[in-house]
């Protein structure tokens, strides 16, 4: 809440109750082995860092796209907390572990007169099957167009 006040998103700490969606807060750590929420074993050598993010005041079950792009950007800028957690090298792309798996993101940044600018952010997502099945409709309930004769 104090961060939201300092960023000018809210006027005072009490306003945070009605504005939990920003700022997004993420915790980063160096890569380590862990087990995802689906039970899949993620190896430290397969990721550059770990990220856990809060959304609406709760730990997010996976990773929000806005947070993923911010992580990519911060990893590309030398010396940031995210860059250091990812090993400190130049990172045009990073693979990070989150509660439900891994995600690869990237960013192209440039420094001009001491200011960093993002030229490009890269993120790819895969879809998962939400439902699969059959629907059986009795013949007598099948839709037929109304008669259009006057």
Annotate the PLM regions.
Residues 1-150:
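Non-transmembrane, aqueous-exposed alpha-helical and coiled segments at domain scale
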């Amino acid at each position: 809440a104090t961060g939201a006040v300092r960023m000018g998103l809210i006027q005072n700490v009490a306003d945070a109750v009605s504005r939990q969606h920003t700022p997004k807060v993420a915790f980063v750590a160096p890569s380590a082995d862990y087990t995802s929420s689906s039970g899949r074993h993620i190896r430290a050598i397969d990721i550059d860092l770990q990220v856990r993010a809060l959304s609406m005041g709760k730990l997010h079950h996976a990773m929000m796209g806005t947070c993923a792009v911010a992580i990519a950007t911060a990893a590309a800028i030398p010396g940031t907390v995210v860059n250091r957690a990812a090993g400190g090298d130049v990172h045009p792309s990073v693979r990070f572990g989150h509660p439900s798996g891994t995600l690869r993101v990237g960013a192209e940044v440039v420094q001009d007169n001491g200011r960093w600018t993002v030229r490009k952010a890269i993120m790819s997502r895969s879809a998962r099957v939400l439902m699969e099945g059959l629907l059986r409709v009795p013949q007598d309930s099948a839709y037929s167009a109304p008669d259009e004769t006057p």
